[in-house]
């Protein structure tokens, strides 16, 4: 990975120079576009569309379109793109990741490429990490696009399908990665063209691209439905596990996140259940319940890995600190945690449709992204998504002071020192942002601050709705904000307060909405913004004198990038600022990787609990541990992708055929091919031995009877009545006779249905039969593929490559599924033929 990163950086230098040249050319057009009237500037949109319609390309109108959007942003928002923002916008248009430091205005940067690419009329998707940011950006940046005559939509979790379709039909659509991915899956489960909401995957700009394409890449998007299963065993084992003792009855590997039951544990569980052998075939499922119950107890921590809200267990993303709404652990893990927390146990689910974010975003013809920290992941973004990372220079020189880590023996001593440091900083009027690794830690620190009488705001998965308001005020003099890792990411902490967000809050309190009352909102905005900016600037000056924003990390994250993101909140736009991490020997990362050596040394030297050490050994150990974990996670994501690649190719085939069937007004040729291929497959299987006397024609006819019901017997063929002397019947003769018979019977079905409702009715029936069969067989296939993947690792014990075996067996299973779709569709259609015959007989009786 290191070598690739180095090579990428070499090419990056040339790219930056090219972007600087482009930005200079756009800036050179500033006076020309500033002299246009509002009407003339707005008319540019139609002019650009006409030029594209006449054969020009986006690159031909690139400079003019950027200059137009830049001038419109100034007139509508009072914000003009800096040179570095134009560079970032150009990098996005060319399909790169623009790495722009916190505070450099990524949201405004996005306006330029979104406007340019929307002119093609194929749709632009701007992807954010949560509903709030999607709605905020659609409202704020959407004001520029709407002013220029483009339509803007936003996909929110509560929208109905019809509303989603309207939003996707807009020129520019804002939404979260989850909502876009789930809509893609739902579209590929639709039974009617009217149920489709997305119109394709043309161009996506992914905000916080590292969070979406890397941190969340290991977790697939899954639409599932309940399956039958008993929840009693989850409760039984939730009561058994607390009676077991770690290291005596079972062992835990926190690094690998695995558990193992020991012989003593097996005996104890057998006694508690009153059974003889836990591993007997009739008890085989109990081992899975036991393992999940132990994992729920040992590896899943409340308020860190999940929270319980309104009687529901909700997963917390370990990287972002945000709740993953609608996501559930699979393979019974979620139910085991529900049993542990004594809340309602919901049914286990069967996968109906699934896709990884990696493969969803690779659907786009052009993909780009923005982030403040992507350099450490440049190689992964290039290998998996073919995205190059370009570091955009800062608008002003960075003045942030990154102080050395302080290491304490205990967590209690560490947090006491943290509170002391906060108290000292705010006494001087300096705002403080405190980063924690979990909801639990943020609330623990909140309690300590409350005891000291220190006013503060808490920003974590439990307080998601107040996120913007809290972050907008985090830069006020003496403000204290406690946040989980990336809570609040996407919203700048501006020294003195964020004037845009504070004004938006004020206008909404007055009852003005940028969507509903766009004109009145714009008038009030232009009137109030200068006053709000002045008030914030006066406060900002006081904060600068106090040293700027102080960012305090209470623990190192296993990813350097997450640490860098936290640090990056300080020192935006050339402001002063400082950062420091407080660590303890009992922090998760220290326990896992630094080990007891350092703690033993501190004990030997009699270092008091409240005295920190600054050690290069510890710092280097942490860096090494982070690099090790990052490499492990990268390998895991690559492994997920390799296995999902098998499913992805199969998914593309099924979804493509499904869409073709959905869009076709006449699928009779599909059905007739299915009839021919199914009959041919039956005959081929029955006549594989080659000699008539070896054929099991009774078995073949029984199968054909269940399939469609031949109008003649095999004896009538073999006895020579139709094919000369007995024994001269060939497999091809048999196939030809059966094909003619089946086709004739299907023609009778078509005649009967057409007589009742016309030919269109027959075509509708064919589609109504085929679509549910495809969906049912695909669901069964997904289940079987999951089952195959669970056990495929054991093939390594037989010196076979699990991935190769998975590809081979998965391919065989996919081919079998396609045959099963044909067979079941043909069977159901001929069943209708039999029903028509029966109705005729009853009518004539």
Curated annotation (Swiss-Prot):
GO cellular component terms, semicolon-separated: cell envelope Sec protein transport complex; cytosol; plasma membrane
GO molecular function: ATP binding; protein-exporting ATPase activity
UniProt xrefs under InterPro entries: Helicase_ATP-bd (IPR014001), Helicase_C-like (IPR001650), P-loop_NTPase (IPR027417), SecA (IPR000185), SecA_CS (IPR020937), SecA_DEAD (IPR011115), SecA_motor_DEAD (IPR014018), SecA_preprotein_X-link_dom (IPR011130)
Membrane topology: Peripheral membrane protein
Positions annotated to bind ATP: 85, 103-107, 492
A Pfam family: P-loop_SecA
Key words, A-Z: ATP-binding, Cell membrane, Cytoplasm, Membrane, Nucleotide-binding, Protein transport, Translocase, Translocation, Transport
EC number: 7.4.2.8
Assembly behavior: Monomer and homodimer. Part of the essential Sec protein translocation apparatus which comprises SecA, SecYEG and auxiliary proteins SecDF. Other proteins may also be involved.
Functional summary from the UniProt entry: Part of the Sec protein translocase complex. Interacts with the SecYEG preprotein conducting channel. Has a central role in coupling the hydrolysis of ATP to the transfer of proteins into and across the cell membrane, serving as an ATP-driven molecular motor driving the stepwise translocation of polypeptide chains across the membrane.
UniProt-recorded name of the protein: Protein translocase subunit SecA 1
